Amino acid sequence: MSRASLLRILLSSLSISSSAATASVGNAQTTTPAAGWARAGTQGDFVVTDFTFRSGERLPELRLHYTTIGTPQRDARGIVRNAVMILHGTGGTGRSFLSTAYAGELFAPGKLLDSAKYFIVLPDGIGHGGSSKPSDGLHARFPKYTYDDMVTAQHRLLTEHLKVNHLRLIMGTSMGCMHGWVWGHTYPEFMDGLAPYACVPAQIAGRNRMIRTMAMDAIRSDPAWKGGEYTSTPPGLRAAQMMLYIMSSAPLVQQTQAPTRDKADSVIRAYLDARMATTDANDFLYQFDASRDYDPSPNLSRITAPALFINSADDQVNPPELGMAERYAAMMPRTKFILLPITPETRGHGTHSAPKVWGEYLRAFLTALPQR
């Protein structure tokens, strides 16, 4: 198997998505699924003027990049009834979902979220993809955004630019899963349902927070980082990526993919080389630091939308032995929590992007989900 093939398999099992599908900045670009999922959809940008962050910092212009597939449909009252927004994980983009394994299983004709019936919205979060981010030029002077800022921006993209006043469903993976909970208590009537996958609705602590802190410290403590004003990639980013790999990987998946010493060395080197070639250190820092004040747990009683909450037993980011998902799900009477058992089809934390594993649960949820 080639290094490229190994890398594609590896990236599919991790929460961080490949950014090979780049954005068309400045102009909307439309293609159809017939051209291949990697080129599907309409891309565009919404520029918010004088955006104020929770920190009090401001940007004169905040660019929000997005991809849409399908057409919004309104009822007699003008309420959009078929919009589904899917929120990506840390380091990913909206177009991360445009793969055969994901879009082909969900958006294709006759599939669960057939884009002929649904209006699919795939935003790039602040600091990610084609949206405004530190590497655009401000570097470490970029505003210190949080998940609350990212959700506020998503809401403005929908309501002010796309003219979507209601969502049938909000899906989210990893960071997007956490954004889903923030959406649920910040805009509780905006959606019919939530489908957050691979997170917990509580502050990031314990091993999860420790690894994130070590990864960020690996960059900040590197003299080559130069306070964010580096001219070449600081080596500390490689150490940070190693920690990310440890956090996101799953023993069974990695043993299957790399059953020999040489294969294991080849896989990890290919992964690290690819990440170093496509990741900016400041963007990485901001993306992980954005979770610093995430904690929806005090507001769970405000979440009134039904939710299908799914984690997998081989997720090392959200290990099931902690019992946290069950504990917090019990605080939300309209939330159904499912812990997927480990199988050859699960992918650790990356199971969040494997519709073949959880698709039937989502089908049952959508079938029973009332309009609000």
Mark where each language-model region is.
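N-terminal cap/lid subdomain of alpha/beta-hydrolase-fold enzymes
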Residues: T67-D136, M324
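Conserved loop-alpha-helix segment in the C-terminal half of the alpha/beta-hydrolase fold
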Residues: A313-K336
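Active-site nucleophile elbow and catalytic-triad environment of alpha/beta-hydrolase enzymes
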Residues: D283-N299
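Catalytic active-site module of serine/aspartate enzymes centered on a nucleophile-bearing elbow/loop
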Residues: T335-R372
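Conserved acidic catalytic loop of the alpha/beta-hydrolase fold
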Residues: D148-R168
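Short beta-strand/loop motif that positions the catalytic acidic residue
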Residues: I303, F309-N311
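Conserved hydrolase catalytic core segment
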Residues: L167-A205
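Alpha/beta-hydrolase-fold enzymes
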Residues: F190-A274
